[in-house]
Swiss-Prot record:
Bilayer topology annotation: Peripheral membrane protein
Protein name, UniProt field: ATP synthase subunit delta
Native source species: Chlorobium phaeobacteroides (strain BS1)
Main location: membrane
InterPro entries reported for this sequence: ATP_synth_OSCP/delta_N_sf, ATPase_OSCP/dsu
Organism phylogeny: Bacteria, Pseudomonadati, Chlorobiota, Chlorobiia, Chlorobiales
Summary of subunit composition and partner proteins: F-type ATPases have 2 components, F(1) - the catalytic core - and F(0) - the membrane proton channel. F(1) has five subunits: alpha(3), beta(3), gamma(1), delta(1), epsilon(1). F(0) has three main subunits: a(1), b(2) and c(10-14). The alpha and beta chains form an alternating ring which encloses part of the gamma chain. F(1) is attached to F(0) by a central stalk formed by the gamma and epsilon chains, while a peripheral stalk is formed by the delta and b chains.
Cellular component terms per the entry's GO annotation: plasma membrane; proton-transporting ATP synthase complex
UniProt GO molecular function: proton-transporting ATP synthase activity, rotational mechanism
Localization (cell): Cell inner membrane
Family according to the record: Belongs to the ATPase delta chain family.
A Pfam match: OSCP
Function: F(1)F(0) ATP synthase produces ATP from ADP in the presence of a proton or sodium gradient. F-type ATPases consist of two structural domains, F(1) containing the extramembraneous catalytic core and F(0) containing the membrane proton channel, linked together by a central stalk and a peripheral stalk. During catalysis, ATP synthesis in the catalytic domain of F(1) is coupled via a rotary mechanism of the central stalk subunits to proton translocation. This protein is part of the stalk that links CF(0) to CF(1). It either transmits conformational changes from CF(0) to CF(1) or is implicated in proton conduction.
Alphabetical keyword list: ATP synthesis, Cell inner membrane, Cell membrane, CF(1), Hydrogen ion transport, Ion transport, Membrane, Transport
Length: 180
């Protein structure tokens, strides 16, 4: 079984159990804290992915690192991953958990790149328009790229909506090149 499929299955099971138990918010907070630590500690991630380190030791290390920072339910999940020799999937499970939670909550993550900083009203109008377009609540990550000259580029999953001056110039160049 590929690691992506396994990560998604563990994340789905964790989210299902958290929803049934009514502690989704606690789990989200716990996993956000774990995500930060794992992102900052390459050594921790390397240890979790190492086949040389046995599951019991991985579980003890996770307990030491996160004791008091996460709930007992989260610690039990860590122990399960270690027992099943899947501790190396922890970072991927956290990402899949977030994606599934957003999916179930009708939230879509959108990357918006513009040539100039959008003011609050422009951002609000763009987000509202994207919400209508997707039919979901939009969580936008805004970034700047002065090389775009003007306009915006929006990425929603695998879909890219490119209304930048650079893109329009490239299309014009391509169209003129075909006619010549």
């Amino acid at each position: 079984m590929s690691s992506t499929i396994a990560s998604r299955r563990y994340a789905k099971a964790l989210l299902d159990v958290a929803e049934e138990g009514g502690y989704v918010d606690q789990m989200v907070n716990d996993l956000d804290a774990v995500r930060e630590v794992v992102a900052e500690s390459r050594d921790l991630l390397t240890m979790l992915r190492s086949p040389v380190v046995n599951g019991d030791l991985k579980a003890r290390i996770l307990k030491e690192v996160f004791n008091g920072a996460v709930s007992g339910k989260t610690m039990l999940f860590f122990e399960l991953l270690c027992r099943k020799k899947r501790a190396g999937l922890l970072a991927d499970v956290i990402e899949e958990f977030s994606a599934l939670r957003d999916e179930r909550g009708g939230v879509v993550n959108v990357d918006v790149t513009s040539a100039v900083k959008l003011n609050d009203e422009q951002s609000r109008k763009l987000i509202n328009g994207l919400s209508v377009y997707t039919g979901k609540k939009v969580r936008a990550r805004l970034s700047l790229d002065e090389h775009l000259i003007g306009g915006v580029k929006v990425q929603i999953g695998d879909t890219i909506l490119d209304n930048t001056v650079v893109h329009q110039l490239e299309r014009l160049k391509h169209a003129l090149g075909e006619e010549a």
